[in-house]
Amino acid sequence: MEELQSYLKIDRSRQKHFLYPLLFQEYIYALTHDHGLNGSIFYESIENLGYDKKSSSLIVKRLIIRMHQQNFLILFVNDFRQNQNNKNLDSQIISDAFAVIVEIPFSLQLVSCLEDKKIAKYQNLRSIHSIFPFLEDKLTHLNYVLNILIPYPIHLEILVQTLRRWIQDAPSLHLLRFFLHESGNSNSFISPKKSISFFSNGNFRFFLFLYNSHVYECESLFVFLRKQCSYLRSISSGAFLERTYFYGKIEYLVIVLCNDFQRALCLFKDPFMHYVRYRGKSILASKATYLMIKKWKYHLVNLWQCHFHFWSQPGRIHIDQLYNHSLHFMGYLSSVRITPSVVRSKMLDNSYLIDNSIRKFETVVPIISLICSLAKAKFCNGSGHPISKPARSDSSDSDIIDRFGRICINLSHYYSGSSKKRSLYRIKYILRLSCARTLARKHKSTVRTFLKRFGSFFLEEFFTEAEEVLSLIFPRTPFSSHRFHKDWIWYLDIIRIHDLANHE
């Protein structure tokens, strides 16, 4: 109990980060617009901010000189409020630099975590495809899964209180509160759509930092459980700022029950508990009974509401049985299929029939959701019939084909792990015919006339590139086509879901 209380309390060693003086350092502004930084999230060019590379250094120096003035902060606040569209150059520069500065405590934690664990190569762990082999190995032995949505909405002031665990100096917290309340509303809540709306025109990196700190707070319970009960040396669970996902194996689970009167510590033994998260959705799979997994559901809701003050409706956590429901996660429909088999065993003069069931993890393409995404992008209608997209008059045929080809290849790579490729072939057909109709519309002709004139060979190159890559990896055999149709292929260089595949 004492260890848990010490973990949940403010860590004094992490508070000694005085970040406000860094606003007066010129190299911070250089780091803000350095596109070569490893792990950088912000890619906005400085030309879009209204100043070029030659004059940016001079502008920053003049800004730092004005910041040393006694009444600069008052003038800065007044200028910011007068420019509601955030067009003031000083405000934009300071907000960009502040987003980099507040990431420093989390970045230091990530570096120290990697150095302590002596992990030389951890880039492959960032591939979101690497989580599916883990699910294939673990979910086939489990019974229930909790589909969890990260609690939203959250009040702006709660974000400031959360960051007090990491930032000690009061000026940084006041500046953080100022940016939050001026970007949105002083009495508003942050929700996914609203946050993107008022941060998309400003500093999107700032929003990503706030989101990661919010998720970090929600998952602090799982971090504590893994540190106390799990010792997997081959798995890194560093800071969530640079992590795409986080999972851990827990043998003995500890849960904190928070209420208005007391805090009780209860122990649940479950050697098969696994946690996976991507963006705002996470899953908690277990081999426990339905009663135990239902207790976990209400424990999480009570923990978020009583300790972290996150209002989370019970409907945002669903309990599904793996054998009866498909798991919609990371753009795939995953399920555990049970295949019955009968084995005849003979001993002396007696023979026996043994019924065995083989559990197999399957991932398929959610064809209906993917067609809806293609329809929103104007590649087809709601029924899946390909339509032409309006093409610019100055776009060449090769540019149009290349644009369609990149979309097709990206979708083929991401859904290469599907156990059923027939749905993927339908998506390729929609993109192929939509490309042909777009070119025919540009040349003011019909698809049939256009294909007769130019032939269909120019559309086949980018649709068959993925198969050519696979032929270089795997040797050709008489059954190679059947093998490509059945094999699951996971790539270790995919760090994000394609926009068309992200239909959750």
From Swiss-Prot:
GO biological process, one term: tRNA processing
Spans through the membrane: none
UniProt-annotated location(s): Plastid, Chloroplast
Keywords associated with the record: Chloroplast, mRNA processing, Plastid, RNA-binding, tRNA processing
Recorded GO CC terms: chloroplast
Pfam families: Intron_maturas2, MatK_N
GO molecular function, one term: RNA binding
Functional summary from the UniProt entry: Usually encoded in the trnK tRNA gene intron. Probably assists in splicing its own and other chloroplast group II introns.
Similarity comment text for this entry: Belongs to the intron maturase 2 family. MatK subfamily.
Name of the molecule in the record: Maturase K
Organism annotation: Lactoris fernandeziana
